[in-house]
């Protein structure tokens, strides 16, 4: 099937956050994955960073290694909004594909439509995706551990509790009968000194491990209100992570 050019999302950060040439990118991702270890049961959700690969590629590889070879029939990648101040609710890309150096990653349009029908907050917002990197940087790893698979990209544009709960309900209802993987794209603290970053990140991760969204919210509020110098955020993908926990 030929995909309409108008709904192909072009890469925004190829050659910046990750290698822009197919062979170089494939080699880089495979090298990161070769250094990762599969350490538990097949996951239903992952948290993966979205910084440049030179900074966080080894962490992303450890996350995606857990999904290598698992036969998922639905994949959703949740990103955060760095680039579009006008984006609202949850911004989905409902059909077509994301063009990438190693080839297009097709959209699961049937699942995307079901999610849009499940909640009116989930809408197609082209501008929210065009320059955003938080989903794009996950895709080379996804292409290597789940080759040929379709996916649904959603940016949690306004990460309010209400929006996260609505998206979580929509995901739960549409994925209930499927073997699904949800990838939450998030970095951790920006930009405190090392000692403070370790403390803040440990607190955030402990809350994530508890699987208690309220604990995560409280941890972030406590850290942000603690007067830590140069702490701009505890978790820039709070919306994707919160949604996944819910």
Which residues does each PLM region occupy?
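Active-site histidine-anchored catalytic micro-motif
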Residues: 3-242
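A conserved acidic, glycine/proline-rich C-terminal tail/linker
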Residues: 244-246
């Amino acid at each position: 099937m030929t995909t309409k050019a108008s709904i192909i999302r072009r890469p925004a950060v190829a050659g910046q956050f990750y290698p822009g040439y197919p062979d170089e990118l494939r080699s880089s991702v495979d090298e990161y994955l070769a250094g990762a270890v599969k350490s538990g049961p097949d996951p239903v959700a992952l948290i993966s960073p979205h910084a440049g690969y030179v900074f966080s590629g080894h962490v992303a590889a450890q996350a995606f290694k857990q999904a290598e070879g698992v036969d998922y029939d639905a994949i959703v990648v949740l990103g955060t909004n760095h680039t579009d101040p006008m984006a609202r609710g949850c911004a989905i890309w409902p059909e077509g594909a994301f063009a990438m150096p190693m080839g297009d990653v097709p959209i699961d349009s049937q699942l995307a439509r079901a999610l849009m029908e499940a909640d009116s907050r989930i809408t197609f917002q082209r501008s929210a995706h065009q320059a955003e990197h938080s989903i794009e940087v996950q895709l080379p790893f996804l292409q290597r551990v789940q080759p040929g698979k379709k996916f649904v990209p959603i940016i949690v544009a306004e990460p309010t509790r209400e929006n996260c709960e609505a998206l979580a309900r929509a995901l739960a209802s549409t994925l209930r009968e499927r073997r699904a993987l949800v990838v939450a794209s998030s970095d951790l603290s920006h930009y405190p000194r090392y000692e403070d970053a370790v403390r803040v990140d440990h607190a955030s991760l402990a809350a994530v491990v508890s699987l208690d969204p309220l604990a995560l919210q409280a941890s972030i509020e406590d850290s942000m209100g603690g007067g830590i110098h140069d702490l701009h955020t505890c978790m820039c993908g709070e919306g994707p992570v919160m949604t996944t926990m819910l």
